[in-house]
Amino acid sequence: MALVEAVEPIIYGNTKTGISFDSITGAIIAGVVVGLAKTAFLGKFPDYVEVLIGVGLLFMYGQYDLLRGIGFVLTADGIYGLIKNYISTSS
């Protein structure tokens, strides 16, 4: 949540710093949607594509709560996957 509060004013160019109920609900719904989508596609998308899609959603459609949630979930999950792959390949 701290990441959202830190990034939100930069992306939207305002002084709003706070997590609204809609953002939390959007993130929960987005987590379920992304989880189901990843299960259906069985991880066929590379992690960097997931990060690019997530960042694109944040920049283009960040004013909509559900799409913002999906963008954050995709970005966070993609970054986690990149870090996990880097650690497992370098060990």
Swiss-Prot record:
Main location: host cell
Cellular localization per UniProt: Host membrane
CC terms in the record's Gene Ontology section: host cell membrane; membrane
Keyword annotations: Host membrane, Membrane, Transmembrane, Transmembrane helix
Protein's membrane topology: Multi-pass membrane protein
Bilayer-spanning residue ranges: 17-37, 40-60, 69-89
Protein name: Putative transmembrane protein ORF91a
